[in-house]
């Protein structure tokens, strides 16, 4: 009897009261098992609803305070179920999916008090879409509305709050250190591409206070890139860089895809736009040991690169550059114009 008691105590210490084992998933580590090259309007709408609901649940449900669930793999399970189904069936699947994470407590009074405070940001996220019963149906809408008031005191594994010093004070900043990077996926399938879109769009939707300043309505970005990522000739890095540039923010920079888009090599010149013309602004930086005369001088104007006018390259590069004003766009464009995919002498 003593041996049995000791064994039971040992087991209870390994699995404390209230602890739930992590959910077991299929192996999605390299493939989402969901791929498309074309999507029609009905599938696009289903995926847009899924992306919104998935992101809202991700940042509002208390079940994600620990590592019991993997939201990336949850998405991969949902994609084949939702993509081609009728709206009513889609909504039922998503409502049942939310129910599967279990019960939770709400803290409505606490949140209402915060929202009534004068310190709340004027342009906070508009989540009125969760009450759209015409699109979501009554049951799914009710679950999302209740989820808004869920008690999230335990935190969220996918986002935490960190602080950085600015103007002699500490300012809060979201830190997405709970996301898996998937470094080995250089050419991900459509499911993983959608994961990129859904992750990024929802990060901006809930944590980027300047999204109302972008040139393009942020609500239009989600369906656009759901469609773009499905295109068979669309480069993943190319579309990711284009999507990030939609923020029109100098801080939104992504190094991936620079070589693929603009070339690995660069003409050794520093240039800038002066009155709309591409001008050499510092001397030629070719090493002295080349023993040749520098082909460019300060003040020279570059009118074409490889027989194509500068205006052509401006049009090609502009959509991949994230800057908040025209001067910064031109400065970044000047650098990219002189890149090339071939290594050859001037």
Residue ranges and their predicted role:
Residues 1-24:
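Bacterial Sec-dependent N-terminal signal peptides
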Residues 20-346:
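Flexible, low-complexity junctional segments that flank or bridge functional domains
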